Amino acid sequence: MQQFDIIVVGGGHAGVEAAAVAARMGARTALVSFDPQTIGAMSCNPAIGGLGKGHLVREVDALDGLIARAADASAIHYRMLNRSKGSAVQGPRVQADRKRFKAAIQKMIAAQPDLHVVGGEVAALRLEQGRVTGVDLADGTALAGRAVVLCTGTFLGGRLFRGEERMDGGRIGEDSAHRLAAQLRDAELPMARLKTGTPPRIDGRTIDWARLPEQPSDDDPWTMSPLTPARPLPQVFCAIARTNARTHEIIRGGLDRSPLFTGAIGAQGPRYCPSIEDKIHRFGDRDGHQVFLEPEGLDDFTVYPNGVSTSLPTDVQVAMIRSMEGLEQAVITVPGYAVEYDHIDPRALRRSLEVKAIPGLYCAGQINGTTGYEEAAAQGLIAGMHAAAHVLGRAMPELDRANSYMAVMIDDLTLHGVSEPYRMLTARAEYRLRLRANNAASRLTPIGLAIGCIGDERRKWFEDRSQARSRLETALAQPATPTELNRAGIPVRADGARRSLMEWLRFPEVTLDGLRDWIGNEPFDPLLVEEVEEDAAYAPYLARQDAELRDLRASDAVPLGDGFPFADVPGLSREMVERLERAQPDSLAAAGRIAGITPAALASLLVHARRRASAAVVA
């Protein structure tokens, strides 16, 4: 029997990050995939990033993950969403060449020491005394492991729907994992079903592009990862089509054959990526919906029509697509479909993403009730880090809602659970001024260095950057008066106040380039300059949050632990006890984020938790 420290099940976006980070930390790791040739495949849209999602990509990258570098290696269209708003809510997004993205992931996986790819279906978990000890493959092969990370995506009990058609599978043309799903249900883990969908693919040669408005790539040469020196591929434009009254009429006429409306699909789909049937049913008064036509590659004629995810019958899909201007002659190469799949209630997980009831078993990605490549990648990274840290005996630095979107997502999942596929949004983060996409390295790379998941190239880059930042901050500590700035051609109001140059950067008239008389002519990295200028601009707001943040971290340090006796806490009403027992918060801070928990209930919890801790010390 082959022996591993970590076994990762599934080669999607969660699986590759989990396996890669565990191997980077020095754990002997197996990545098990149905078909190794599909590792890193983009199952749905050929894009990475977006609002909230782009923050996750940058955070995974800051911990030396794969997704951002693969996105840059395959990007054929860059667009910064929300560019007109503050940087805290801007969303970097790239359109990727689907084949090149997968190739980039597979190249990094193949080059990673201590990472071994195994082809096959995981049919069962190996368990001893309630703890996971490895996996059994469908061909009879057994793999021993000290921890297992499940990253099954939509393959866990997956079933595909298109009109009246029904097929087993997690993705078109690929099998689903029914035996593993049955074992998890038999273990009495809390499970449910969710659904997602994908639009039809179109042959781009049959689109009349000249009649459609173009959406070009951004001119300024930003990249997803700071380790990418320049964009390696030529850029293409996307185009925008639009549904119309005729389109809506066709869709309504096909609803009686849609599995969403016949009752064949009972699971809830993603709120922020609804099917076109659902859009027309819910928003029938609108005169049209945008459809973004996104090329899937430089040497691939396939186009992804973003905005028309559907499980309507193929003939209805053809009529729907051809009803739109510019698409009258469009040829569908692969019809759209919906997929329904099993997921675990994420409230059954610790914040490490370890299953509470089965020590050594971790879950990441859509199995936890999320949707999206970026959410999956972030969970895979966190689960892999925690699994490797546990196996290798390392202390895991704490991530919390004030230092990462990843922690916001995991806290939301493990505390509140899901009733629909969870998507990251900037609005979910209370401390989003601290969690900008462009400062992810400053926030998280030191944590990665502490846990040992950062490679040599990023370590050298970060050390050089930290030294440059130190030099810049030293220069910006110099004081200056309004008169001195005016003499340098900077038109600030002459209020007589003497401020540090860092404080002066809060004023809109002052830029770092304008302060060259003080800081010299060192050519600082533009991304570092942008980050420092924004740190200065946001400083007053961040200072106001400091007291709140201290309270958060202090209450996070009051553990409640598994099996906390909420019913024994004096002063808690029956309603409070029921809410707490349902959510099973692991700290006082987590209890405070449960809907309906009152300040009085938290005060009672605090007193009881401290008494228990004191009694445990005495004992």
From Swiss-Prot:
Any GO CC annotation of this UniProt entry: cytosol
Amino acids binding NAD(+): 269-283
GO molecular function, one term: flavin adenine dinucleotide binding
Record localization: Cytoplasm
Matching InterPro entries: FAD/NAD-bd_sf, GIDA_C_N, MnmG, MnmG-rel, MnmG-rel_CS, MnmG_C, MnmG_C_subdom, MnmG_C_subdom_sf
Main location per the UniProt record: cytoplasm
Cofactor: FAD
Keywords attached to this entry: Cytoplasm, FAD, Flavoprotein, NAD, tRNA processing
Biological process terms in GO annotation: tRNA methylation; tRNA wobble uridine modification
Positions annotated to bind FAD: 10-15
Subunit organization: Homodimer. Heterotetramer of two MnmE and two MnmG subunits.
Similarity annotation: Belongs to the MnmG family.
Function: NAD-binding protein involved in the addition of a carboxymethylaminomethyl (cmnm) group at the wobble position (U34) of certain tRNAs, forming tRNA-cmnm(5)s(2)U34.
Name this polypeptide is given: tRNA uridine 5-carboxymethylaminomethyl modification enzyme MnmG
